[in-house]
């Protein structure tokens, strides 16, 4: 059975919804009434899934995970499976978790589940809880995860509903796999699943990525061919009108101001720069705290809120922008990338040639210009920097000021 055209319709993935009461939750993923409408992104995902699987790309705290959870909660014609794989290190872990989750969500599979593939636990499957099933699968998959894992996914063809796998942070899992040959094989194995008709006609995938995937792929010794069948959808910053609505909604819900003066909106957007949702949440949170402490809401108060946001006790708001470089890159490369960012923050704008000279000097000829180009692309993709002609600068004044204060 092929996936019905209407099964992937965006309206079935997402019920257009803005909660009656939305809290300003800074940092962790949100759901329900706290989820801010990103209908255009969810509609694009739904339309794309009619034809192919999706790579959903966004920096940390851009709402990627919240969007994936919203799809999980509102998928009507799919059997949705949501897994965060950031902490996984082996293909057999990945396979055992996904298959056991499908079994848990789809009881009609149990009579045919795992048949004729040589797994000894079958005779007792009715008595095995999901956790024990996961452990047993992992043990059985250790020696031959490539072939046996493929056979396991073939069993999903009997599912009444098409299965939607929502896999968050897949590049970080690939980064965690110590053996690069295994990592490379796993990427090709995943692509193979998406290409096999007997599997692909009953499955779709949404992979979430908070880091540049191409550098990870290059680092394990393969090419972008392993993901070129995916539709890449990037979660961008707000449009001006979206940002204005977002600001009005948050301030109204927290301190009950229905008709917010335009000078407050303009002041917030000027201070933050590029209207990234998380950055707006942080400064609004500080602004509201000042108002609740007895201060009068005015454009002048925005400067104080901005200073509070950059204060040492709030340093953790943005520390992940620094820490994630050590997770993403090898130690020497992480050090070089940090130096490049510090140079850009200090000088405001830096020519690409000057950055290349710094890169060559620090790497000492151990990497080529393709790697340099990939790094700059990743830094753009992750909203650290933006390119203007041949010059690079920080994408937001806020992040530049924070970087200069603590790492400049």
Spans of model-derived segments:
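Accessory beta->alpha helical hairpin/"wing" motif in late/C-terminal subdomains of nucleic-acid enzymes
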Residues: 388-402
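Short amphipathic alpha-helical interaction segments
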Residues: 363-381
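Walker A/P-loop-proximal flanking segment of P-loop NTPase domains
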Residues: 6-74
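A short, conserved structural fragment
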Residues: 380-389
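Alpha-helical DNA-recognition elements
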Residues: 74, 286, 378-381
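P-loop NTPase nucleotide-binding core
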Residues: 52-62, 66-180, 203, 369-370
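Winged-helix-like regulatory helical subdomains adjacent to P-loop NTPase cores
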Residues: 271-367
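The catalytic "switch" region of P-loop NTPases
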Residues: 17, 161-163, 172-271, 278, ...
